[in-house]
Amino acid sequence: MRKIIHVDMDCFFAAVEMRDDPSLRDIPIAIGGSRDRRGVISTANYPARRYGVRSAMPTAMALKLCPQLKVIPGRMAAYKEASQHIREIFARYTPLIEPLSLDEAYLDVSDCQACSGSATLIAQEIRQAIAMELNLTASAGIAPIKFLAKIASDLNKPNGQYVITPDQVLPFLRDLPLSKIPGVGKVTAKRLQELGLITCSDVQNYSQAELLKRFGKFGHVLWERSHGIDEREVSPDRLRKSVGVEQTLAEDIHDWESCESLIEKLYIELETRLRKVRPDLHIARQGVKLKFHDFQQTTQEHVWPQLNKADLLQVARTAWNERRAGRGVRLVGLHVTLLDPQLERQLLLSWE
């Protein structure tokens, strides 16, 4: 049985700022763009979160919720430096490290002999080392499979950890809301609820064939996760190639204005996700996906050096006008393809 740890730093960007400037510790702060430039919040500290300030929220909205909020533009070099130090701490225990972003990673410690092989104690030591060496806090989840380790890391935040042992997997899943499973968004959760599927135990008693019929490949993933199946390995060589966000609509849309409004909202989430893996927002290309009421779909892409909303809207408008053929749209998605590190320098120079 594998031993997987998911480590997630606590409000990482904001925590680095509070560490380096103690005067910020007890006041609400957020990292993000300015209100004048229609900026977006990347992360907020816990005092700010008490006012309802959240990541991916427009800065203007955050300031309405919390007028005294101090918005900081961010220092990506400092965040990268801290992230590298954290990964060096991970490497003391295992070479099997799969970074998800600057502030979170999976570790497979199945063969680690430290702490007598106890994943719980290894996670505790890692968190203590981060606190002592960087003066930052981290939370951790420990489980025999990846998605449960990720869920567990959120259960004792901040500065805590949660363990799900192999014999606790099925009891833990029994009452777990399906909305906690990665990939189940608000619209999917609503569709599941309409079928009477609210917790994993509901799916355990539901027809797998019916799930496949209604949700396609994701229905299979949902069935597996609800039964405690996740065979994905921790992959240290995994190179993230893309970042995306999409939304399935409760009702089809038929007018461009509705699509444009949805893209405006999705763009905020896409920018937030991309900034966690590419703080400079440099990309190889960006694109739009439209899925129609007959479940046919189309993808339109454009080579572009940096995430750009105006270009995405133009690409989407082209797809809407040329490929919709009067059909209602049931899903809208945005995505970017990341630069190949080996080609990044040449590609970026060609755009200068």
UniProtKB/Swiss-Prot annotation:
Cofactor note: Binds 2 magnesium ions per subunit.
Site (Substrate discrimination): 13
CC terms in the record's Gene Ontology section: cytosol
GO molecular function ontology, one term from the record: DNA-directed DNA polymerase activity
Record: active site: 104
Keywords: Cytoplasm, DNA damage, DNA repair, DNA replication, DNA-binding, DNA-directed DNA polymerase, Magnesium, Metal-binding, Mutator protein, Nucleotidyltransferase, Transferase
Chief location of this protein within or outside the cell: cytoplasm
Domain UmuC: start-end pairs: 4-185
Name the UniProt record assigns to this protein: DNA polymerase IV
